[in-house]
Amino acid sequence: MQVLKINPRGYCYGVVDAMVIARNAALDKTLPRPIYILGMIVHNKHVTDAFEEDGIITLDGDNRLEIIEQVESGTVIFTAHGVSPEIRDIAKRKGLVSIDATCPDVTVTHDLIREKSAEGYDIIYIGKKGHPEPEGAIGVAPDHVHLVQSSNDIDSLNLTNDKLLVTNQTTMSQWDVAHLMDSLKEKFPHIEVHKEICLATQVRQEAVAQQAGEADLLIVVGDPKSNNSNRLTQVSVEIAGTPSYRIADVSELKIDWLKGINKVAVTAGASTPTPIVKEVISFLDQFDENDPSTHVIKRTVTLDKILPKIKTPKPVDKIMPHK
């Protein structure tokens, strides 16, 4: 089968940084145990399973407040998606050592919200309800930030403040964000616009928009919880006009999808491990619709191949608790 490997695809620097921080934490014997991650360090279950093998426990819950309530002692790692100041304070009050793996692009948005809310602005934040990144960003200034996900949310906004600003979750579809920002500019002509789609998200989406049209089908390799992976599927269908499926790994591929397909494109979300993507590409490369021996799907990538290798462990930056 013809396989079009869309570039760039896979890991972004924020994800790699977060994983390296967590791996160094696992190797740092001075950190109080147990070591917990507040939610998925990045939205990929293969990664969180690999960290469990490393002795780092991923805690789950509806929100970060609910998750940190589960922790009584040890060390907590804040995920790449960022956390609110309230969570940082609770960690300190509980006597926990904290490690911050927030993506630098998310920190930029937090700084913007902090600065503008102090100047008296109301901030409209375009993001996905229930996702940890908006939760952390809104928590920077809860009384000033208003989450919108759709045109209906914009219709129901009732803001009279002359100081208005719009920003967004870094992993949204850039076309959705542009559309919603246009609607906001119509409703509030004086609004200041700060588009914060991270570069990694942007270039991956643009690559799909430009290249997926050359194929009959696009396979996106990414976790179901990964917003940027799900957006790549959306971009393929809505912008490139190419049908698309998202799979967590090769075991989720369906042979029926490949019947009658001459050329398949492959990309991956920013938190998808490279070996997982390579395994999908290898399967598609050897696939022949008329040869049943090429239809056997088996995942062989083991957890020890998932995380970045650390040759020289480095001490992690610790945020110490209140004495």
Swiss-Prot record:
Its family remark reads: Belongs to the IspH family.
- Keywords in alphabetical order: 4Fe-4S, Iron, Iron-sulfur, Isoprene biosynthesis, Metal-binding, Oxidoreductase
One GO-annotated biological process of the protein: dimethylallyl diphosphate biosynthetic process
Annotated Gene Ontology MF terms? 4 iron, 4 sulfur cluster binding; 4-hydroxy-3-methylbut-2-enyl diphosphate reductase activity; metal ion binding
Q: Which domain of life is it from?
A: Bacteria
What residues bind dimethylallyl diphosphate, as annotated?
43, 81, 131, 226, 228, 271
Q: Which residues are (2E)-4-hydroxy-3-methylbut-2-enyl diphosphate-binding?
A: 43, 81, 131, 170, 226, 228, 271
Function as written in the Swiss-Prot or TrEMBL entry: Catalyzes the conversion of 1-hydroxy-2-methyl-2-(E)-butenyl 4-diphosphate (HMBPP) into a mixture of isopentenyl diphosphate (IPP) and dimethylallyl diphosphate (DMAPP). Acts in the terminal step of the DOXP/MEP pathway for isoprenoid precursor biosynthesis.
Q: Where along the sequence do coiled-coil regions lie? A: none
Give the source species: Lysinibacillus sphaericus (strain C3-41)
Which protein, by its recorded name, is this? 4-hydroxy-3-methylbut-2-enyl diphosphate reductase
Free-text comment on the cofactor: Binds 1 [4Fe-4S] cluster per subunit.
The protein's annotated catalytic reaction(s) are:
isopentenyl diphosphate + 2 oxidized [2Fe-2S]-[ferredoxin] + H2O = (2E)-4-hydroxy-3-methylbut-2-enyl diphosphate + 2 reduced [2Fe-2S]-[ferredoxin] + 2 H(+); dimethylallyl diphosphate + 2 oxidized [2Fe-2S]-[ferredoxin] + H2O = (2E)-4-hydroxy-3-methylbut-2-enyl diphosphate + 2 reduced [2Fe-2S]-[ferredoxin] + 2 H(+)
- Residues that bind isopentenyl diphosphate: 43, 81, 131, 226, 228, 271
Gene3D superfamilies from the xrefs? 3.40.50.11270, 4-hydroxy-3-methylbut-2-enyl diphosphate reductase, catalytic domain
Assigned EC number: 1.17.7.4
Q: Which residues bind [4Fe-4S] cluster?
A: 12, 103, 198
**GN (gene name):** ispH
